[in-house]
Structures are given as structure tokens and as C-alpha cells.
């Protein structure tokens, strides 16, 4: 329920900060704090039939009916987590996940202008409450670039240059058959659009294109998938991306009442063994959080690249063989190559 009828005034006594959902969030933030991770806090949208959704409907999350109420609640959350709970790991926020399809008004996809209005309202509220400098705004968060268009990002970079600290996009269209040049071209367009606004571009989600609905990928248990993920990441970084985020770290349920079919089985490692009791993979699992083969390839990338590193692209004569050189802030170099072909490749570095 709403705290009051005045979005300009936060009634802290009406907020529930000890709910099961908040306790779950605290556990994740505690781990991030302990492991010195940097967190981007994303709100998916206004839940259907929630007071923030108002009359908007059409999916399990929709656009907020009132930007002012939405901004008040988002501000209250950030104030509580950073000022009261003292979480220093929260560095960035993304106000809505993939708004190009999820930002629904009256059951229909809203225009980009509606999303832009919300972001500007959020920026004003954070400034009013004195917390704007505490977190960066990662905006656009679009999925439409992944289906061959950059229109959503283009509109956001035009209209939110003075609001965003970074722009980000998601993609799941690249696979074993995708040449390096295609991946490079996709991200270069994102990079140039963001650069025109004076901001970096981050790939906030990426994975392969062997999708089975939103919760499965056919090649998830193959080592070769890890090599593909590295090849995609190399090309994204070579094209100018400020960073990449594989989706997702671990198998997970989005909702506690979801069916087994709804479990997101996209992780670098699995969830607890009992969660797979009805699956054919159950008998072969020996431990909780079993690591998938793709982890061993992808972690060769993530274990050696640190935030703030410089990227120096390495050209190769093969469209399915990618390389890059990374100079970390401590001056140490890392050379990364991903061979997506069936033939061995010789590497000579001089």
C-alpha cells in the first residue's frame, strides 16, 4: 500500500523493511559487500495490481502509473539501503529491466518518451533528496538491439544525455555461426550512440542464441558454450563496450512459487541439487551448486581482468577466432584468445 497521498513526503513508518523479500535482498547485498562486489540494483517495474501500477496492466511488471510515486519509493529504498543499512557495494541503479517491451501502459508498450519522462523524474527526485551522487544511473537497458535495431538506445542517448551516467543494452542473438564482424558491428553502433551522448556503453546482459523460451538454452551444459561466451565478450570489448555481464551467474527462480519449468537455468553453475529432483540430470549431480563446464572457459576471462583495465584489440585472420590484450591498472597484461573453429590455432605474440 502507499505510504501516503503525497509523493513529495516520505512516511518512513509505512514502509516494510523486514519483509521476506527485503531479507532476501539483504542476504545478497551482504554477500556482495563481503566479496567486495559492485552492485547494480535493478527494479523490474511496477508489479501488476500493485498501487504503483495503478490502472496499468498487461504483464507481471508494467510501467508505474505515477512517476512521482515511483520516484519517491525508489528514493526511499536507496536511502534506506545506503544510509541506514550502510551498504557501500551499491554503485548503480537501473530503474526498469528491458523497458522496450516491459514498460507497459494500459496493456500496450509505451513510447520511448514515457520511459524517458520516468528517468527524468527519478533524476529530479534523487537530486531533491540529496542522493543523486551516491549512485550512477544505467539507462536504456534495452533488448531491442539484440533483434537488429538500435532505435530505443538511440532515443535514450538523444534525450537522456544529461541524466544517464552510462547506457546499457542486452543481447541474445549471437551463436556459434555468428562471425566476429557481426558482433563487432552490433556493439560499435551501441558504442557510437553512447559516445555521442558523452557516456560509455555497457552490455548489461548477454548469452547465446540457443534459446528455449526465456528460461533455458539448449547448449547450457557444453564446454564449447563457454568458449563462445568468451568469443562474444572479446568482440564486445574490442568494439568499445565498457564492460559485459553474462546472464546469469547461477540458476535461479524469479518467484518463490514458480514451477520447475520457470527456473532460470542459464547459470555458470547450478542451484541446490534437490531443486532438480524431477530432472534427468539429478542422478548425475553430486553436490549443490554444481559448476557447469562453460564456467571453466568463461572464468579464464573473468579471473584475470579487473575493473578499470584497458582493452587493446588483436586482429586475427579468422572470423571465428578472436583475440584481445588487456592491461590491468596494476600494469599487468592479459592476452585472451577464443577459438570457435574445429581446428587448432597457433599463437605467436611478439
Predicted region positions:
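Aromatic/acidic polysaccharide-binding cleft in carbohydrate-active enzymes
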Residues: 203, 207-299, 312-320
Amino acid at each position: 500500500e502507499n505510504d501516503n497521498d503525497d509523493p513529495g513526503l516520505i512516511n518512513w513508518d509505512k514502509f516494510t523493511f523486514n519483509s521476506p523479500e527485503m531479507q532476501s535482498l539483504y542476504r545478497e547485498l551482504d554477500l556482495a559487500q563481503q566479496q567486495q562486489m559492485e552492485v547494480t540494483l535493478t527494479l523490474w517495474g511496477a508489479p501488476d495490481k500493485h498501487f504503483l501500477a495503478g490502472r496499468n496492466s498487461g504483464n507481471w511488471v508494467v510501467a508505474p502509473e505515477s512517476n512521482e510515486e515511483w520516484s519517491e519509493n525508489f528514493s526511499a529504498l536507496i536511502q534506506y539501503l545506503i544510509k541506514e543499512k550502510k551498504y557501500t557495494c551499491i554503485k548503480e541503479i537501473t530503474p526498469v529491466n528491458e523497458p522496450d517491451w516491459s514498460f507497459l501502459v494500459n496493456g500496450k508498450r509505451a513510447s520511448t518518451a514515457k520511459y524517458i519522462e520516468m528517468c527524468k523524474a527519478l533524476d529530479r527526485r534523487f537530486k531533491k533528496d540529496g542522493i543523486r551522487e551516491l549512485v550512477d544511473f544505467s539507462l536504456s537497458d534495452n533488448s531491442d538491439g539484440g533483434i537488429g535495431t538500435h532505435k530505443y538506445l538511440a532515443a535514450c542517448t538523444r534525450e537522456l544525455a544529461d541524466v544517464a551516467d552510462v547506457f546499457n543494452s542486452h543481447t541474445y542473438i549471437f551463436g556459434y555461426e555468428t562471425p566476429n564482424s557481426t558482433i563487432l558491428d552490433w556493439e560499435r553502433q551501441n558504442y557510437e550512440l553512447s559516445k555521442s551522448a558523452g557516456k560509455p556503453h555497457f552490455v548489461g546482459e548477454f548469452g547465446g542464441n540457443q534459446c528455449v523460451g526465456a528460461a533455458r538454452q539448449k547448449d547450457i551444459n557444453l564446454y564449447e558454450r563457454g568458449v563462445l561466451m568468451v568469443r562474444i565478450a572479446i568482440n564486445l570489448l574490442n568494439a568499445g563496450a565498457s564492460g559485459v555481464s553474462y546472464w546469469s551467474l547461477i540458476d535461479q527462480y524469479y518467484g518463490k512459487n514458480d514451477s520447475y519449468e520457470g527456473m532460470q537455468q542459464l547459470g555458470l553453475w547450478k542451484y541446490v541439487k534437490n531443486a532438480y529432483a524431477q530432472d534427468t540430470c539429478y542422478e548425475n549431480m553430486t553436490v549443490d551448486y554444481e559448476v557447469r563446464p562453460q564456467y571453466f572457459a568463461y572464468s579464464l576471462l573473468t579471473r584475470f581482468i579487473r575493473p578499470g583495465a584497458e582493452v587493446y584489440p588483436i586482429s586475427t585472420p579468422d572470423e571465428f577466432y578472436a583475440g584481445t590484450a588487456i592491461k590491468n591498472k596494476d600494469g599487468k597484461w592479459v592476452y585472451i584468445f577464443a577459438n570457435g573453429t574445429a581446428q587448432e590455432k597457433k599463437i605467436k605474440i611478439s
